[in-house]
Amino acid sequence: MNRAILIVAHGSREKPAQQEFKRLVGKYRQRHPGWKIAHAFLEMAEPSIPQALESLAVTSSEILVLPLFLFTAKHVRQHIPEILTAFRKKHPGAKVKLGKPLGADPQLLDILDKRLRHLS
């Protein structure tokens, strides 16, 4: 099975924010050089989620979507699933799975502590 990973961010009109996200995805690609990894934005920037899904579907039969969102709010609970449902209808043979947001992962507490130390 040809698997791809799509990392999704909210999106921003500000180019520096878009570039920051792209750099993060690039670093993740470096960590996993054999994996097919792409990025997309929910809104305000490109590629959009549908654009990225279409591109990945050309060579991948399974797409794992990782939302780079902190909590399970409306975007993760409703908006992204709606986009994935529309894609599945258009590509019935495609296997698309949506991962969980970052959530209350204990590692986030360590990051908060680190940020606090930098302020002290």
Identify what each model region corresponds to.
Residues M1-S120:
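Active-site-proximal alpha-helix that buttresses catalytic centers in soluble enzyme cores
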